[in-house]
């Protein structure tokens, strides 16, 4: 009703940007004739203006808004010259939304990557840095190489953060004007910086502005999982193994929904991902273990048993994890990608290792942690892009204070979303999907099937193999991950069938007829990389294009001489290329490689540099480099030959109706379903989508409840007969909304609890940073001492009693425990003084004693006292903060139980957590002052060794 009266608020928001777009389009006439030199000079001109107002954030904000039209016009022109891509008007609007610190919802294929160049250029002009955040290393690297060329052309430095980089490389890249990185690298670097022992180890500078690509994936899907840096803790692995054996013998209850007592040893709450032992279960577990109490504090077993049952019932192989190289590797439930190096905490990972019979890794203790919610709120200005944000608009606004604005598409969508079809059983559904794939494949239409787990993608693959239908599989299995970008590049070709696990955020567009540009780059890499990349340096390659081959003769730069690991060949699978190359194209490729070897030397470049040469050659940026010119000539010829085939295929595929997307199960989130749908019909292409569902699907089973069970009995139909029912569809959407609300509540709870930790984290990290930078360390230690003296006085003097009853002797002894240099202090010196006067007197005595201590230490080595101060403060902060994190975790678990006693667990957590924090700060102060006075380096030893 409001929309009818006031008009769509989104339309109003977009409308206010229209005059700016008109202004930019008018400026284009002035900027187009500029020479490259004059265009580049614009950056320096903008920077000069911004330097004058850098002291005032308000003035800087105002000036950036003033510069926006011209800066965007400059970026549009530079992009046209370097990449051959001109920003559409709607992309300009997207850039403005991002500059205003909002979320821009843009459909798949509308060029989000190009949009990000606009606000990142404008916000980097201040010299304070801009971060472009992506979901994985491959996308960060692709965007840094591809879009980075435009920024570099305009005189900005571009940095890239990748896994495995050294601290020096990281610092250099963070100091660039624009830095491309993944959310996890940024978060972990922040935590590591706050564990640094010396200021030189800190790699990040203060945050300024960030654009997050796939913002919903990072700020919502990953918000339930905090980033954790942990250290190892020794726990006996026999307990995990024994618990796993016991869990295997315990029986799951089958009558959990009825009013009767549960019949098994434990109940499983799939919705809450939890397990509960029944009374009989406790008795059986205790008997099997031969113990009298699972909760015995001297020999606790409950934690191990609960985790072992969770591993058995809730953590499924090839769905939640895969086993690779004798290790358990987690599979991300939203992207379907493996997450090597990530481990479940709290002993869960060990329980799964025990279940699978692989080596049990040591359990870990949290050293530092932060949630993505609180990490990204550290940025003064934050923005994001995604194809689907409107469904989570409320959460973005409440948690992050980010508005969502939908950017109009450049061309009208021609995608048809067909109604869902529902089958009675899961097997009936899969057979129908395989039949649909066969039919469409025979017609020549490309098909993309989205599955929710590795296991299901492999089951469908088996069904298609039985029917002899060629297809590509894209899931978390390592052999498939390696070819990810290749598979996506040809998913739009005539008759292609692609099965993908959770397609969201796959980063490469599906182009009808096939992606000639990407295939041409792949061909270039095949020739170029083996001859140019140094042998030590086939380090972290782009996921999806590295092939491994062991059988080539070593003389060709391949093979595995002396039994070493197989060398990378960069060889793509032969069936990806749409055509055989002409002799002319092959000659050009060989000539480019020969010139490269002659110029740089054979196998002499790092992989990053070699990749960068190809990326530059594949664009249009002017270059004087003869090697790039040769490579470009070869690339253009190869692309031309491939395009002759792909353009023809594209016309045929468009005629047939474009890409058809099949969803095989409704995801827990409507947004992920919409992302899958968005793969079809990009940039005005035709396309269609349909979801195939069954009454046995998880979502309906867990959240649909009894209504679905009744429906199942009501439908006395064959398993391969589709059911179309409005009630079913409504039931499904209701289930999805329920799940979304449920997960939103979990994220909200994670956020609220971490908010308590966040205030403490900020305080402790600020204190730590002050110490690292060495600012007034002596004054800080003396303040610690003065606070300690005050606390001793307050603890030993009761102001309600007459002064002759004060135990001054005890007070003086306590002071001497901390400051042994005050051994001459006597109780009678404090007689006749008020508590305040005693405090002032002790402050003076402390300062005298500290100066004396400093003189003693600096005789051994000048400046040693400052080093000792830094060392002891950092040591105490780190040790006690680590213990505090454990105490807060234990507190969080215990307050959860207080909800039963009508108390608000969050309020209890806040107040008790605050008390714990104050206790920790007191302990830090006391331990530091005690350590400083007890510090006694020996002159004959090398003094540094004492403190570093």
UniProtKB/Swiss-Prot annotation:
Classification via InterPro entries: Helicase_ATP-bd, P-loop_NTPase, SecA, SecA_CS, SecA_DEAD, SecA_motor_DEAD, SecA_preprotein_X-link_dom, SecA_SF2_C
Q: List keywords of the entry alphabetically.
A: ATP-binding, Cell inner membrane, Cell membrane, Cytoplasm, Membrane, Nucleotide-binding, Protein transport, Thylakoid, Translocase, Translocation, Transport
What Pfam families does the database record attribute to this sequence?
P-loop_SecA (PF21090), SecA_DEAD (PF07517), SecA_PP_bind (PF01043), SecA_SW (PF07516)
What the entry lists under CDD domains is as follows: DEXDc_SecA, SF2_C_secA
- Keyword Transport in record: yes
Please give the Gene Ontology molecular function terms for this protein.
ATP binding; protein-exporting ATPase activity
Matches recorded under NCBIfam families = secA
Per UniProt, subcellular location reads as: Cell inner membrane; Cellular thylakoid membrane; Cytoplasm
Positions bound to ATP:
91, 109-113, 509
**Functional summary from the UniProt entry:** Part of the Sec protein translocase complex. Interacts with the SecYEG preprotein conducting channel. Has a central role in coupling the hydrolysis of ATP to the transfer of proteins into and across the cell membrane, serving as an ATP-driven molecular motor driving the stepwise translocation of polypeptide chains across the membrane.
On assembly, the entry states: Monomer and homodimer. Part of the essential Sec protein translocation apparatus which comprises SecA, SecYEG and auxiliary proteins SecDF. Other proteins may also be involved.
- Say which enzyme class the record assigns: translocase
Is Electron transport one of the keywords? no
- Catalyses which reaction? ATP + H2O + cellular proteinSide 1 = ADP + phosphate + cellular proteinSide 2
Record-level GO cellular component terms:
cell envelope Sec protein transport complex; cytosol; plasma membrane-derived thylakoid membrane
Query: Gene name, please?
Result: secA
Q: Under which name does UniProt file this protein?
A: Protein translocase subunit SecA
Q: Which family is this sequence assigned to?
A: Belongs to the SecA family.
Chief location of this protein within or outside the cell: membrane
User: What membrane topology term does the record carry?
Assistant: Peripheral membrane protein
The EC code for this enzyme is 7.4.2.8
Task: Enumerate the Gene Ontology biological process terms.
Answer: intracellular protein transmembrane transport; protein import; protein targeting; protein transport by the Sec complex
């Amino acid at each position: 009703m409001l929309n009818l009266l006031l008009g769509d608020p989104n339309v109003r928001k977009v409308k206010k940007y229209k005059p700016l777009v008109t202004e930019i389009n008018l400026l284009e006439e002035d900027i187009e004739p500029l020479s490259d030199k004059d265009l580049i000079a614009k950056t320096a001109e903008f920077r000069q203006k911004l330097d004058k107002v850098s002291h005032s954030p308000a003035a800087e904000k105002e000036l950036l808004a003033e510069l926006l039209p011209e800066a965007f016009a400059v970026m549009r022109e530079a992009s046209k010259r370097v990449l051959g891509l001109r920003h559409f008007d709607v992309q300009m609007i997207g850039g403005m939304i991002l500059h205003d610190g909002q979320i821009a919802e843009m459909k798949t294929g509308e060029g989000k990557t190009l949009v990000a160049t606009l606000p990142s250029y404008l916000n980097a002009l201040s010299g304070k840095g801009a971060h472009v955040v992506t979901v994985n290393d491959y996308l960060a690297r692709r965007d840094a190489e591809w879009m980075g060329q435009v920024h570099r052309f305009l005189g900005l430095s571009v940095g890239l953060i990748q896994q495995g980089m050294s601290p020096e490389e990281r610092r250099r890249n963070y100091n660039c004007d624009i830095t491309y990185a993944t959310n996890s690298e940024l978060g972990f670097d922040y935590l590591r910086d706050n564990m640094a022992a010396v200021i030189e180890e800190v790699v990040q500078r203060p945050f300024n502005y960030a654009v997050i690509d796939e913002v919903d994936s990072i700020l919502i899907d990953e918000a339930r999982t905090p980033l954790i840096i942990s250290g190892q803790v020794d726990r006996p692995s026999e307990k995990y193994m024994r618990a796993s054996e016991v869990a295997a013998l315990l029986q799951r209850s089958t009558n959990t929904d009825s009013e009767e007592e549960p019949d098994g040893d434990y109940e499983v709450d799939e919705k809450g991902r939890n397990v509960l032992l029944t009374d009989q279960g406790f008795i059986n577990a205790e008997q099997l273990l031969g113990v009298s109490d699972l909760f015995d504090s001297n020999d606790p077993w409950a934690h191990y048993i609960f985790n072992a049952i969770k591993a058995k019932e809730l953590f499924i192989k090839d769905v939640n994890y895969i086993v690779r190289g004798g290790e358990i590797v987690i599979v991300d439930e939203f992207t379907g990608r493996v997450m090597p190096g990530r481990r479940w905490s709290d002993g869960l990972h060990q329980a799964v290792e025990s279940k699978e019979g692989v080596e049990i890794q040591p359990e870990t203790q949290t050293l530092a942690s932060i949630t993505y919610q609180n990490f990204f709120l550290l940025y003064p200005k934050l923005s994001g892009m995604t194809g689907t944000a409107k469904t989570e608009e409320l959460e973005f606004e409440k948690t992050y204070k980010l508005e969502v604005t939908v950017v109009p598409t450049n061309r009208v969508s021609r995608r048809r979303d067909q109604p869902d079809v529902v089958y009675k059983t899961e097997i009936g559904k899969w057979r129908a999907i395989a039949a649909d794939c066969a039919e469409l494949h025979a017609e020549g239409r490309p098909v993309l099937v989205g599955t929710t787990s590795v296991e299901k993608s492999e089951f469908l693959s088996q069904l298609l193999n039985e029917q002899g239908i060629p297809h590509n599989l894209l899931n978390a299995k390592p052999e498939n991950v390696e070819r990810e970008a290749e598979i996506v590049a040809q998913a739009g070709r005539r008759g292609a069938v692609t099965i993908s696990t959770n397609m969201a955020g796959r980063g490469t567009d599906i182009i009808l007829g096939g992606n000639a540009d990407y295939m041409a780059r792949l061909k270039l890499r095949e020739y170029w990389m083996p001859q140019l990349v140094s042998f030590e340096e086939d380090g972290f390659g782009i996921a999806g294009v590295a092939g491994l081959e062991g059988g080539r003769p070593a003389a060709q730069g391949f093979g595995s001489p002396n039994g070493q690991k197989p060398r990378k060949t960069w060889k793509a699978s032969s069936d990806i290329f749409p055509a055989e190359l002409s002799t002319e194209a092959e000659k050009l490729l060989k000539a480019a490689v020969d010139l490269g070897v002659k110029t740089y030397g054979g196998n002499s470049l790092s992989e990053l540099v070699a990749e960068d040469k190809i990326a530059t050659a594949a664009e249009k940026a002017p270059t004087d480099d003869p090697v790039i010119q040769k490579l470009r000539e070869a690339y253009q010829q190869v692309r031309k030959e491939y395009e002759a085939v792909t353009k023809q295929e594209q016309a045929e595929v468009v005629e047939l109706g474009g890409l058809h997307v099949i969803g095989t199960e409704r995801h827990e989130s409507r947004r992920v379903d919409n992302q899958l749908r968005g793969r079809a019909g990009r940039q005005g292409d035709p396309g269609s989508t349909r979801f195939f569902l069954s009454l046995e699907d998880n979502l309906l089973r867990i959240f649909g409840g009894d209504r679905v069970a009744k429906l199942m009995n009501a439908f006395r139909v064959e398993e391969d007969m589709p059911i179309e029912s409005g009630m079913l569809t409504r039931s499904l959407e209701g289930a999805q909304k329920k799940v979304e609300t449920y997960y939103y509540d979990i994220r909200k709870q994670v956020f609220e609890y971490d908010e308590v930790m966040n205030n403490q984290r900020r305080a402790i990290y600020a204190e730590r940073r002050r110490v690292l930078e060495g600012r007034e360390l002596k004054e800080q230690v003396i303040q610690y001492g003065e606070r300690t003296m005050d606390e001793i006085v307050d603890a030993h003097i009761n102001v309600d009693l007459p002064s002759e009853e004060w135990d001054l002797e005890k007070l003086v002894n306590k002071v001497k425990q901390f400051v042994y240099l005050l051994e001459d202090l006597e109780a009678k010196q404090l007689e006749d003084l008020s508590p305040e006067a005693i405090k002032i007197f002790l402050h003076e005595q402390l300062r005298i004693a500290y100066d004396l201590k400093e003189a003693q230490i600096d005789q051994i080595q000048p400046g040693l006292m400052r080093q000792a101060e830094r060392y002891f403060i950092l040591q105490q902060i780190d040790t006690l903060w680590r213990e505090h994190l454990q105490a807060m975790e234990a507190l969080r678990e215990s307050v959860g139980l207080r909800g039963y006693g009508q108390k608000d667990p969050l309020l209890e957590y806040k107040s008790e957590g605050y008390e714990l924090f104050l206790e920790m700060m007191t302990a830090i102060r006391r331990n530091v002052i005690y350590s400083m006075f007890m510090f006694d380096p020996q002159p004959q030893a090398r003094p540094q060794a004492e403190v570093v």
